[in-house]
Amino acid sequence: MDISISWVVIIVFVLSYLILMDKWRASKLPGNPPPSPPKLPVIGHLHLLRGGLPQHVLRGITQKYGAVAHLQLGEVHSVVLSSAESTKQAMKVLDPTFADRFDSIGSQIMWHNNDDMIFSRYNDHWRQIRKICVSELLSPRNVRSFGFIRQDEMARLIRVFESSEGAAINASEEISKMSCAIVSRAAFGSVLKDQGKLADLVKEALSMASGFELADLYPSSWLLNLLCVNKYRLQRMRGRLDNILDGFLEEHKVKKSGEFGGEDIVDVLYRMQKDTEMKAPITNNGIKGFIFDVFSAGTETSATTIQWALSELMKNPEKMVKAQAEVREKLKGKTNPDVADVQELKYLHSVVKETLRLHPPFPLIPRLCKEECEVTGYTIPAKTRTLVNVWSIGRDPAYWKDPDTFNPDRFDEVSRDVIGNDFELIPFGAGRRVCPGLHFGLANVEVPLAQLLYHFDYKLPSAMTAADMDMSETPGLSGPRKNPLIMIPTIHNPTS
């Protein structure tokens, strides 16, 4: 009995202490904090994140409490931005203040303590690798130079679709293979023998690293960090990934050039690594981190966007007919169309923009507020974790008529682009941390999509109708489809 009473006293004492600490932290919030839902002791608002994908749940919270909302997730204070106005203020007016990333167990393990570009802190290392990326690796000129790779891999994909004419094909799987091959050849100068293993690892890592870890939300708890099972899974995965990348890089050092000669992305990184005048030397882990950036951001996002575009066109047959008519008229007689050719395809551009509006590659963009500031009149404390809900902004009726409807024609009336200038549509982010690979990514979406629409007509399997299509998403950094896209391709006959 005495032991039971002692435990009750201890539990009451601990809970009382945690509640008092919780109230003390809340009282320390400066100025005019953003509105916040009622919270529970110790866990704060964690219970509100149940029951759906994070971007969906957070949209419901900001619809109720305002476009700028404060959440306490465990010990961590976070702010969600779900309007173009608040996002513009954070990413443009206060860009240097919000240019940092916050650490997580997933990013630290998979990206070697954030020694890459996507998750690096805003510092000399990030500025340097960003400059290399923009001027050397993924510039518009280099994107055009990768045209022969896109053409080669598209020819392979077309052969696969032709061989499956009249039969159901897993379009998601084949498109992912094509996207991975393009990135592999651009990065390493050749198709990798373990390319499939690398692609599977990247997909699994993105899924695992995109969740909320309790150890991230209670950073003061060494016990939660110790008991974090996902951490050990990620460490094992990181080891497997290192083994593959180390092998690729060693092979790359001894070969003279890629399959088509000239410099690939790894060549440029090795050349820069030897530059003694660089402020922040590029390490081998930094090279592996950047390659992982290219594969994770370049492979998954491009493939996912093509899959969503085809899904939306299959679900909206009248839009499919219009897109195919434009492509077949403008590209008639062009055997190997590339970036310059698709510039003429106005409706295709609208299809891609509408797809990115409804299915952004990064539904939530993480930032860290470095110092206290004000966003739309609300005080944001220093070191506050910030999540920009790109998915929610793209479906906000304040900016978009019939926001849940796939309608590429809306861009005839609304002049908005995806490069970070229009904050109603920022699938690649905005400000100084806008995705440097957006030109590479768009080329790897628009060119393959145009050719798939040009060469084939499509039907759904068995008795499925457009209304039956499952458009559900699954958790992941790139917002992928829950189920693969299965279609029946038939070769287009211009005379029929």
Curated annotation (Swiss-Prot):
It catalyses: gamma-terpinene + 2 reduced [NADPH--hemoprotein reductase] + 2 O2 = carvacrol + 2 oxidized [NADPH--hemoprotein reductase] + 3 H2O + 2 H(+); (4S)-limonene + reduced [NADPH--hemoprotein reductase] + O2 = (1S,5R)-carveol + oxidized [NADPH--hemoprotein reductase] + H2O + H(+); (4R)-limonene + reduced [NADPH--hemoprotein reductase] + O2 = (1R,5S)-carveol + oxidized [NADPH--hemoprotein reductase] + H2O + H(+). Pathway: Secondary metabolite biosynthesis; terpenoid biosynthesis. Pfam families: p450. GO terms for cellular component: membrane. GO terms for molecular function: heme binding; iron ion binding; monooxygenase activity; oxidoreductase activity, acting on paired donors, with incorporation or reduction of molecular oxygen. It is an enzyme of class 1 (oxidoreductase). It is a single-pass type II membrane protein. Keywords: Heme, Iron, Membrane, Metal-binding, Monooxygenase, Oxidoreductase, Signal-anchor, Transmembrane, Transmembrane helix. Residues 471-496 are annotated as: Disordered. InterPro entries: CYP450_71D (IPR052306), Cyt_P450 (IPR001128), Cyt_P450_CS (IPR017972), Cyt_P450_E_grp-I (IPR002401), Cyt_P450_sf (IPR036396). The chain crosses the membrane at residues 1-21. The monoterpenic phenol thymol is widely used as a fragrance and a flavoring ingredient in food and cosmetic industries. Its derivatives have also several biological and pharmacological properties such as antimicrobial, antioxidant, anticarcinogenesis, anti-inflammatory and antispasmodic activities. Medical applications include the treatment of disorders affecting the respiratory, nervous, and cardiovascular systems. It may also act as a growth enhancer and immunomodulator. The monoterpenic phenol carvacrol is commonly used as a fragrance and a food flavoring ingredient and preservative. Its derivatives exhibit also various biological and pharmacological properties including antioxidant, antibacterial, antifungal, insecticid, nematicid, anticancer, anti-inflammatory, hepatoprotective, spasmolytic, and vasorelaxant. Phytochemical inhibitor targeting the main SARS-CoV-2 viral protease (Mpro) and ACE2 in human host cells, carvacrol is a possible candidate for treating COVID-19. Heme binds at residue 435. Its main location: membrane. Its EC number is 1.14.14.-, 1.14.14.51, 1.14.14.53. Involved in the biosynthesis of phenolic monoterpenes natural products thymol and carvacrol which have a broad range of biological activities acting as antimicrobial compounds, insecticides, antioxidants and pharmaceutical agents. Catalyzes the C2-hydroxylation of gamma-terpinene to produce carvacrol. Mediates also the C6-hydroxylation of (4S)-limonene and (4R)-limonene to form carveol. Belongs to the cytochrome P450 family. This is Cytochrome P450 71D180. The gene is CYP71D180.
